[in-house]
Amino acid sequence: VAYVTVLIGLAGYGSHRLAIIFLYLKHARKKPVPLELFSELPLVTIQLPVFNEMHVVDRLLDSVSKIDYPIDKIQIQLLDDSTDGTVEICRDGIARLVAQGFDAEHIHRTERTGYKAGALENGTQFAKGEYLFILDADFVPNADVLQKTIHYFSDDKIGMIQTRWGHLNRTY
């Protein structure tokens, strides 16, 4: 009886794996495309939540400043809950972005209510954009990330987009 039960379980598991492989191969070549392109690009608020991440903040701000999107259609919020030297690095980085013409602000909270979710909620109260683009502190987005993704929102059925991401290295 135990042997038959295990055999049935393994057969079910194997069948499921084969079905997943089949579906992957069936749809692997299909690349999704937006239904239409926006005639005028919408305003996007880029939210960057950070907490004591002094080693990666400058890299993050530099990569965000290189995103290929009209500068007048971007609002950058650096949502900083840091308790170390990251606060000064954030302040200086935002000042550099403002000097480049970006609508950028450093929102520093001393009470971490809700942690990252709380920082995002707090920033959303001041967001001007029609869409939110959230990047973790260790992300380095490609310059074309908004151009490749924003047009999917022309479909009313799309409410969120998750893109593929990877890691640069193990330390920072």
List PLM regions with ranges.
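Internal catalytic domains of large membrane-associated glycosyltransferases
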Residues: 30-172
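N-terminal membrane-anchoring/stem segments of glycan-assembly enzymes
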Residues: 1-40
